[in-house]
Swiss-Prot record:
It comes from Castellaniella defragrans. GO terms for biological process: isoleucine biosynthetic process; L-valine biosynthetic process; taurine catabolic process. The lineage of its organism: Bacteria, Pseudomonadati, Pseudomonadota, Betaproteobacteria, Burkholderiales. This is Sulfoacetaldehyde acetyltransferase. It comes from the Bacteria. Optimum temperature is 30 degrees Celsius. Keywords: Acyltransferase, Cytoplasm, Magnesium, Metal-binding, Thiamine pyrophosphate, Transferase.
Length: 598
């Protein structure tokens, strides 16, 4: 391919709308698109390759949109997904919602029915804009072929600038014809650190703080602000906790790192945050689910003064009461706050050594607790352990499995986790040294997220090891994408926790419905065998001493032999805490025939 194929045409030119569409994507740095081929955009697809764009075909369009999400989160570029009008597009809705809640810049291109047939109920016709209106930052509908480049460019700009998905809706007949237009070039947005008044106020609060704590959120990752966060933390001697499911927002080897908040997060992080007199929430919206009580700790500091930094002003004070709100880029804001406190007399300097000792003590205690916490200790889990000791086969404790996986992870690894009980318990064990390493479905929490997302991440960073976690329930929704890995030489490693149940929801039946189990059991065939049938490697692990070596061998095969491996780990049916005790109540039955169901 000649290098000049990536050179965007300059000035007003005569071209087709398909050419305008493709040239605008080239101008925005697009090199990969995820999706399934379709007649609705075939004229444009025909010139993807000469433009230096690769269409990566998938098994299901939901997987394509998740791949675009993972690609964007690793690369820092805009992910792109495309599909056939109607059912191909509706298949993307769930994954675009996940990208929305992860603040991921993704452009979903939605070709639709031709203009002469709209409203007649034709083949694969649908009103596609309403499908995505809740989960996009911007929806562009091409109203005339001559405006193809304009709308395409605007969707990329909005996705990038507003940190979320944008929809580009194109009537399929608008790809054809002749137009005259100029290809718009992207204009990067300089967000800046925030207003001087709010930054001054933040610096004053931190100067007065005796026990400051920093919450490092997704904005630190997306804004490449880890070094600035680190410098500020070191100046303050402040413990740094990761916001929920942003475990890669601060290096785990740093002495001030204390682990994640949220479900199954770090007790050290929670105990230290509970004692804060000033909290700097850097690049986080302080989401409600990620700050719920956990481990019996209602840890949010009710009397602390809160400084919240977010690039989206709508997030400031939305969930938690704040003292100072800074609307700014996390990187620029952290650097500017550091500059302001440089040379100031800080109250926390007086107890820096004492606080450092406390931080280390809390971390040591939590690490020891995790080491000793080999299995769940609630009555149901103990019953399951006893029951399965009498069954054929060998079943491993999930917590021990997660600990062994943690120890075997390479430093440069990327990990995605699905929703579910074991996957969420993994929050205690996932530690990272660099940003853009950890991906989860965030507040959307959809099953089937992890595997396609890590495929997209691997496309963006083929030099990095890529590992996904899924339970056997969620795995059933996405395992068909093994064929995508094999067909298109995208090697990844998938860990499947085979405990034969929908664990997260079943835990609610344990705690609230007297162990009346409905639709929660999942007796499954061999996932390793299915993987082998699809052309990948498949390994069954049922001894704890084999967990780490199996992961290391699979990653070696991924990186050196370009092999995709599914590691099926046979786990007991023990279960961690329910996600939300506040979301359910003990049942009340008023009709006589249901009285026993309490």
């Amino acid at each position: 391919m000649a290098n000049d194929t990536r050179q965007v045409v300059q000035g007003v030119q005569e071209m087709t709308p398909s050419e305008a569409f493709v040239e605008t994507m080239v101008a925005n740095g697009v090199t990969e698109i995820f999706g399934i081929m379709g007649s609705a955009f075939m004229d444009a697809m025909d010139i993807f390759a000469p433009a230096g764009i690769k269409l990566i075909p998938v098994v299901h369009e939901q997987g394509a949109a998740h791949m675009a999400d993972g690609f964007a989160r690793v690369s820092g570029r805009t992910g792109v997904v495309i599909g056939q009008n109607g059912p191909g597009i509706s298949n993307c809705v769930t994954a675009i919602a996940a990208a929305y809640w992860a603040h991921t810049p993704v452009v979903i291109v939605t070709p639709e029915a031709g203009t002469t047939g709209i409203g007649l109920g034709g083949f694969q016709e649908a009103r596609q804009l309403p499908m995505f209106q809740e989960f996009t930052k911007y929806q562009g509908h091409v109203t005339h072929p001559a405006r193809m480049a304009e709308y395409t460019a605007r969707c990329f700009a909005r996705a990038r600038d507003e940190m979320g998905p944008a929809q580009l809706n194109i009537p399929r007949d608008y790809f054809y014809g002749k137009i005259k237009c100029e290809i718009p070039l992207p204009q990067p947005l300089d967000r800046g650190p925030g207003g001087a008044q709010s930054l001054d106020a933040a610096a004053r609060l931190l100067a007065e703080a005796k026990f400051p704590v920093i919450i490092s959120g997704g904005g630190v990752v997306m804004g490449d602000a880890v070094e600035e966060c680190k410098a500020l933390a070191e100046r303050l001697g402040a413990p740094v906790v990761n916001s929920y499911l942003h475990n890669d927002s601060f290096p785990a080897s740093h002495p001030l790192w204390c682990g994640p908040l949220g479900y199954q997060g770090s007790k050290a992080a929670m105990k230290l945050l509970a004692d804060a007199d000033v909290v700097l929430a850097l690049g986080t919206r302080l989401g409600p689910f990620g700050t719920l009580p956990q481990h019996g700790l209602d840890y949010w500091p009710k009397n602390a003064r809160i400084i919240q930094v977010d690039a989206d002003s709508k997030m400031l004070g939305l969930v938690k009461k704040i003292t100072v709100g800074v609307c700014g880029d996390a990187k620029a804001s952290a650097a500017e706050i550091s500059r302001r406190i440089d040379g100031m007399k800080l109250a926390c300097d007086a107890n820096k050594a004492e606080r450092a000792a406390r931080i280390q003590a809390e971390k040591d205690a939590w690490e020891q607790e995790l080491t000793d916490w080999t299995h769940e200790r609630d009555p149901f889990s103990l019953d399951m352990i006893e029951e399965q000791s009498k069954e054929e086969g060998n079943w491993l404790h999930p917590r021990q499995v997660l600990r062994e996986l943690e120890k075997a992870m390479p430093e440069d690894v990327m990990v995605s986790t699905d929703i579910g009980n074991i996957n969420s318990v993994a929050n205690s064990y996932l530690r990272f040294e660099k940003p853009r390493s950890f991906f989860a479905a965030m507040s959307w929490g959809n099953c089937g997220y992890a595997f396609p997302t890590i495929i997209g991440a691997k496309v963006a960073a083929p030099h990095r090891p890529a590992v996904s976690y899924a339970g056997d329930g969620a795995w059933g929704m996405s395992m068909s994408e093994i064929m995508t890995c094999v067909r298109h030489d995208i090697p990844v490693t998938a860990v499947v926790f085979h405990n034969r149940q929908w664990g997260a929801e079943k835990k609610n039946q344990v705690d609230f419905y007297n162990r009346r189990f409905v639709a929660g059991e999942l007796e499954s065939e061999s996932f390793a065998g299915i993987a082998r049938a699809m052309g990948a490697e498949g390994v069954v692990v049922d001894r704890i001493e084999d967990v780490g070596p199996a992961l290391k061998k699979a990653i070696d095969a991924q990186m050196n032999d370009r092999k995709t491996t599914v590691i099926e780990i046979m786990c007991t049916r023990e279960l961690g805490d329910p996600f939300r005790r506040d979301a359910l109540s003990k049942p009340v039955r008023l009709l006589e025939k249901y009285r026993d169901y309490t």
